[in-house]
Regions:
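Acidic, low-complexity, intrinsically disordered interaction modules
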Residues: 31-114
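Negatively charged, low-complexity tracts enriched in Asp/Glu with abundant Ser/Thr
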Residues: 2-25
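Non-Sec secretion/translocation targeting segments of pathogen effectors
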Residues: 129-132
């Protein structure tokens, strides 16, 4: 007997909230597989080959992964050559602004934004950076 993942209405709602972002971002793609659920691909924009993939089985995992990617995209736009855990207060504000249209559609997932920034802050407290 084979196992089939079910794409729930909640998963579809999350995917729909990120539709504009997914359509406009060339370095990622989101696919559905009945065998593993959502597959989040990162794509090399120069070679057009996949670089990595994540299997996402729940709406919460999907939302967290997409919010995290949006934050990374904002940081790449600042051209300061650092990763997500090194962002400053201004960058954190830009990330929140980017998240706002999505969270307005998914207010029950707003806690993930705080969780992502808190994780970044906890990683950076060791290095003396304050994101508050």
């Amino acid at each position: 007997m084979s196992f089939k993942m079910k794409r729930t209405l909640e998963m579809r709602r999350v995917e729909s909230a990120f539709a504009d972002y997914l359509e406009n971002e060339d370095s990622i793609d989101l696919l559905w597989s009945d065998k593993v659920g959502y597959v989040f691909l990162t794509i090399n924009e120069k070679t057009h080959e996949s670089e990595s993939c994540d299997d996402l089985h729940t709406a919460t995992q999907l939302c967290h992964r997409l919010l995290d990617d949006m934050a990374i995209t904002v940081l790449l736009q600042t051209k300061r050559n650092h990763n997500f855990t090194n962002m400053d207060k201004d960058e954190a504000a830009r990330v929140r602004a980017a998240w706002k249209p999505v969270i307005e559609k998914l207010p029950d997932y707003a806690y993930l934004c705080d969780e992502i920034l808190r994780e970044a802050q906890e990683n950076e407290e060791e290095n003396g950076i304050d994101l508050q």
